[in-house]
Design a protein with these regions (language model features):
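Conserved loop->alpha-helix
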Residues: 1-117
Length: 119
C-alpha cells in the first residue's frame, strides 16, 4: 500500500527488452535503504516489484499490459520517474491509502492557473 505522496524522482539508467517483458533499471540511490528483492515500489504511481538490486541500481519488470495501461510504456533511458516506497507498519499516513494498481491512463486536456494553485 502507498500514501500517494511522492518521495522524489529517480532516473531510468537502462531498459532491456525480453520476451513479453521490459526491464527498467532505476538508480534509487536516495531511496534504497533496506530495500529487498520482492519489495513494492511505486514508479510514477504504478506498483512495481523489485526483481534485482546491485548497489543502488534496482530492476523492475513490466509486462505488456502494464506498459499499455500506464505511462511506463512511454519512458526511455534518462527519463525520471516519481518514486514512492510502500508503507510499513508505523509509517505516517500523510496522504491517502492507495494500492498503485493502475486501471488506465488519462490525457490532461486543460490546466487552469489560479494564481497559487493549478487545477
Amino acid at each position: 500500500m502507498f500514501t500517494g505522496i511522492v518521495s522524489g524522482t529517480a532516473p531510468i539508467v537502462k531498459i532491456e527488452e525480453k520476451d513479453f517483458i521490459r526491464t527498467f533499471t532505476v538508480d534509487l540511490d536516495k531511496y534504497d535503504d533496506n530495500l529487498e528483492i520482492g519489495a513494492s515500489v511505486a514508479l510514477d504511481g504504478v506498483c512495481m516489484t523489485v526483481v534485482s538490486i546491485e548497489n543502488n541500481l534496482v530492476k523492475f519488470d513490466a509486462i505488456e499490459e502494464t506498459l499499455s495501461r500506464t505511462t511506463l510504456g512511454k519512458l526511455s533511458v534518462d527519463s525520471s520517474v516519481n518514486i514512492e516506497r510502500s508503507l510499513k507498519m508505523g509509517d505516517e499516513l500523510g496522504g491517502h491509502i492507495i494500492s498503485g494498481h493502475v486501471l488506465m491512463s488519462a490525457k490532461i486536456i486543460q490546466i487552469k492557473d489560479l494564481s497559487l494553485i493549478h487545477i
